Amino acid sequence: MRLSYLFIGFLFLTFMACRKSEGITTDSSAKLSFSMDTLLFDTVFTSSGSTNKRIKVYNSNLKAVNITDIKLSGGTSSYFSLIINGQSVNQKTNLQIDGKDSISIYVKVTIDGNNQTEPFIAQDSILFNTNGNKQSIALIAYGQNAVFINNQTISSNTTWTSSLPYIVYKSVTVAPQATLNILPGTKILFHGSSAMNIKGKLVANGTVANPILFSGDRTENFYAEEPGQWNGVHFYSSSSGSTLNYTIIKNAVIGITADSLSTTNKPKLSLTHSIVKNMTIAGFVGYNTQLDAFNNLFYNAGQYLLYGVAGGKYNLKQNTFAGYTKKLARKTPSVYFSDSDNGRPAANLNIQIANNIIWGSLAEEFLIEKKANTILETTIRNNAIKTLLKTYEGNFNLLNIDPGFIDPIKYNFMLQDSSPLKNKGFGYEQ
């Protein structure tokens, strides 16, 4: 008896399943609905192509509908391409959607280059014909010409201008004895795990109004502040005298790496009036290197904002190191120095720190460790520091006094009018 019930149940389910696709309505009022009426692509660099974006097409009718035709209005000359219900085609005929069901259409855009320096618009539409009903979805993309750099070495003095963004694939390397000058307003965008390798000299001189940008090449809003999109800028042992002034370095694994002392009487790197943010590991990593940093903002790194080990020379004035993260679970101090590092020889460490704010969400945000028989010289004066140590008391330092950022959770590190740090800085020059 039980088998009979099971058999009847099976027949019922089979009958109901068949009914879903049974009958195709030809009613002219049976229209499709869409997840959006306009699909917008943010800046798409010419020749590189976009990611796929999805549109859902719904049949809200009880009966199935037959879509006579789905196609791109621009046909074969369109910048856009489609994947319709799993097939890479730009036109499909007689596609059936069961009642109360849907299909997916994926859209990609690849824009040919031209001679324009300003962004331009590429447009098309997807056309649907169902029971005589003509419906459409608008497709809009903002195209941008660019200079593409693919695993390139710069062997002579070169200047990059702001007329077009530079898109780096794999790497760009400045050879020893060569200088790369970057003018105000220039954008250098890195694809995937690419990097900039400086074996000569980098001179990036932006301005307040037109800073220079180093970032990933993903232009969608989701990636605007997403760490880990490229590998960062690396200054090698043959490099010296580089400058980063009014620059924004963001969304990398390690923003800046410098692996040795300068070979001249100038610092390895002079970093001024810049922002270093959104790093998977660290904002700056130095191995027995020399850094002059003046009036910079560091924030949102997975481990360290500044990590200087194996000795070195550090002159830090009027910087803000704000150890706040949203997605990255940091357990290390924002600023860390040591004369040693695993696998590298220990070396003397000279640290000059004045007028800095070193603050964050942890109890210990500043740590100096001497582990070897080296010389440690420090001048730590007139800073606001969050620390468990009493080592830095005196010398006009303010310990564990909240600086009063306007909104650190939203990464606004301007000081409130009531901040205890207002008018407390000494008049240090760069």
Model-derived segments and spans:
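Short acidic/proline- and small/hydrophobic-mixed sequence motifs that coincide with surface turns
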Residues: 50-51, 62-67
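Asparagine-centered strand-capping/turn motif at beta-strand->loop junctions
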Residues: 57-61
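Beta-strand/loop edge motif enriched in small/polar residues
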Residues: 19-25, 32-43, 48-54, 91-430
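Positively charged n-region of N-terminal signal peptides that target proteins for export
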Residues: 1-5
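Hydrophobic helical h-region of N-terminal Sec-dependent signal peptides
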Residues: 8-12
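Short, solvent-exposed loop/linker segments at beta-strand-coil boundaries, enriched for Pro/Gly
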Residues: 73-91
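C-terminal motif of bacterial Sec signal peptides marking the signal peptidase cleavage site
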Residues: 14-17
